[in-house]
Amino acid sequence: MTQQPATELDLELSRLDSEYRQRDSGGYPAERYGLFDEATLLHSECLERNLLALLKRHNFTDLAGRRILEVGCGSGELLRRFLEYGAFPTNRCGIDLMAHRIELARSLHPGIDWQVGSGHQLPYADHSFDLVMSFALFSSILSESLREEIAEEMWRVRKPGGLILLHDFMYANPRNPAVLGMTRQRIRQLFNRRGAAFDFRRIVLAPPISRAVAARAWWLASTLEQLKIANTHTIGVINLE
């Protein structure tokens, strides 16, 4: 039997698998990206503060009965935080391409529904979730067609009136060709729907600056982050009634 040539989708999924395995095997040292590093802590606090502010702004603070999905959940760190925000474990679902990450997530919080799979083929029924979210997912995907398929799936499983929440890099990393900048224009094009409302804000001080400043002068790093001029990430919600 003649073997079919690999499609663009196959090649991109294979590249992502290789990239994530490299990261998890030591390409991203814990001492630099763990919360004991001041720059990482600044990033984490900024993300959480703006995430909660957005949910409050969009009247999404009563999470007890809401169904929540994270696409590209990794080991589930961010999804687990929603327990502190009032979400029930049985109403939270996470899916990730990497089986070993999901195994870790299940060991840390078995009450959440964790699935191994790709965001372009979500194993959920239409209109299943009140909140569908991703964190630093789309900037890792270099294939435009795969990004589009994942966006379509996120729309498909979102309930009418539900929110799509995205957090990602705004700019490409010149030192890392595996990262694509997700500008607001690119996000709008990717999730374009008639009547869709986009509410995005610029967050997270540029990592080179925060690494140089945060450990020496936390107040200065925090002030620079609040000024937003040197911020490199975006977070926001998309709503469609």
PLM ranges: what are they?
Residues I141, Y171-Q189:
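Acceptor-substrate binding/catalytic loop of class I
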Residues L69, S75-Q121:
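Class I SAM-dependent methyltransferase SAM/SAH-binding core
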Residues H120-V132:
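A short acidic, Gly/Pro-enriched loop at the edge of an enzyme's catalytic core
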Residues E148-P160:
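A short glycine-rich, Lys/Arg-flanked "PGG" loop and its adjoining helix->strand segment in the class I
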Residues M1-G34:
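N-terminal, positively charged/glycine-rich alpha-helical extensions of SAM-dependent methyltransferases
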Residues G161-D168:
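Conserved beta-strand signature within the Rossmann-like core of class I S-adenosyl-L-methionine
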Residues S44-A64, R81:
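Conserved alpha-helix/loop element of class I SAM-dependent methyltransferases that forms part
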Residues Q185, Q189, F200-E241:
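A C-terminal cap/extension of S-adenosyl-L-methionine-dependent methyltransferases
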